[in-house]
From Swiss-Prot:
Pfam families: HSP20 (PF00011). Residues 34-77 are annotated as: 2 X 5 AA repeats of [RC]-C-L-C-D. It comes from Sus scrofa. Component of the outer dense fibers (ODF) of spermatozoa. ODF are filamentous structures located on the outside of the axoneme in the midpiece and principal piece of the mammalian sperm tail and may help to maintain the passive elastic structures and elastic recoil of the sperm tail. Gene3D superfamilies: 2.60.40.790. Residues 209-250 are annotated as: C-X-P repeat region. GO terms for biological process: cell differentiation; spermatogenesis. InterPro entries: A-crystallin/Hsp20_dom, HSP20-like_chaperone, ODF1_ACD, ODFP. Interacts (via leucine zipper motif) with TCP11. Interacts with SPAG4. Interacts with KLC3. Interacts with CCDC42. One of its GO terms (cellular component) is cytoplasm. The gene is ODF1. The modification Phosphoserine is found at residues 5, 10, 64, 86, 122-123, 151, 167, 189, 194. This is Outer dense fiber protein 1. Sequence repeats lie at residues 34-38, 73-77. Coiled coil: none annotated.
């Protein structure tokens, strides 16, 4: 459990790091698509549209064209194209970086969902379903006949040339409940990362009742097995109310029984 908790904490830290990088990339993308002269110089400087006769990048560098502080080789005074990289290439790089970060974030979320699903045997989480792209009011959970069904449906409407077009998107996941979980005790929650968690207040049974497992609500002992791991049900153990001896052996050790038979 300690190793699993450490792994989940590491995945959460990675997801937060990716979210921060995505926000930084969005800021860079907004900065790169906007000209600081309040004109869209895309993809070139377009000095003919500048309100000044020339770009004045060298005389008023800090006021008229703030980009020249980053690219000092601007040749706007002679009405040539700027030697800085094209904003289109910067946009393409930013878009590729954003797509890579989104794929990495989706991969981390899938890994987290798999870890949560695999940890169901050691926690009260029975299952986890990813419903990314759906609102909480569009998700429905139904528990019936020992099964949990998670479904979600969304309607998209498009206006095209005066006509309306519709498209539908839906998912449906179903899994069975453990034998010791009551349907009335099953609850669900819409958590972080568009993930629906199915939970129960009682832990699922992981192993059958045996003398080495003490009594618990989900693991009741057999009448022949005492509620003590050190006292298994066998003819060799001493007499006590929870562990009666075999009629062939009196209350004592095996030596006394063998002596009586001889």
């Amino acid at each position: 459990m300690a190793a699993l908790s450490c792994l989940l904490d590491s995945v959460r830290r990675d997801i937060k790091k990716v979210d921060r990088e995505l926000r930084q990339l969005r800021c860079i993308d907004e900065f790169s698509t906007r000209c600081l002269c309040d004109l869209y110089m895309h993809p070139y400087c377009c000095c003919d549209l500048h309100p000044y006769p020339y770009c004045l990048c060298y005389s008023k560098r800090s006021r008229s064209c703030g980009l020249c502080d980053l690219y000092p080789c601007c040749l706007c005074d002679v009405k040539l194209y700027c030697l800085r990289p094209s904003l289109r290439s910067l946009e393409r790089k930013a878009i590729r970086a954003i797509e890579d970060e989104k794929r990495e974030l989706a991969k981390l979320r899938r890994t987290t969902n798999r870890i949560l699903a695999s940890s169901c045997c050691s926690s009260n989480i029975l299952g986890s379903v990813n419903v990314c792209g759906f609102e909480p009011d569009q998700v429905k959970v139904r528990v019936k006949d020992g099964k949990v069904c998670v479904s979600a449906e969304r309607e998209n409407r498009y206006d095209c040339l005066g006509s309306k077009k519709y498209s539908y998107m839906n998912i449906c996941k179903e899994f069975s409940l453990p034998p010791c979980v009551d349907e009335k005790d099953v609850t669900y929650s819409y958590g972080l990362g568009s993930c629906v968690k199915i939970e129960s207040p009682c832990y699922p049974c992981t192993s059958p009742c045996n003398p080495c497992n003490p009594c618990s609500p989900c693991n009741p002992c057999n009448p022949c097995n005492p509620c003590n791991p050190c006292s298994p049900c066998s003819p060799c153990s001493p007499c006590n109310p929870c562990d009666p001896c075999n009629p062939c052996y009196p209350c004592g050790s095996r030596f006394s029984c063998r002596k009586m038979i001889l």
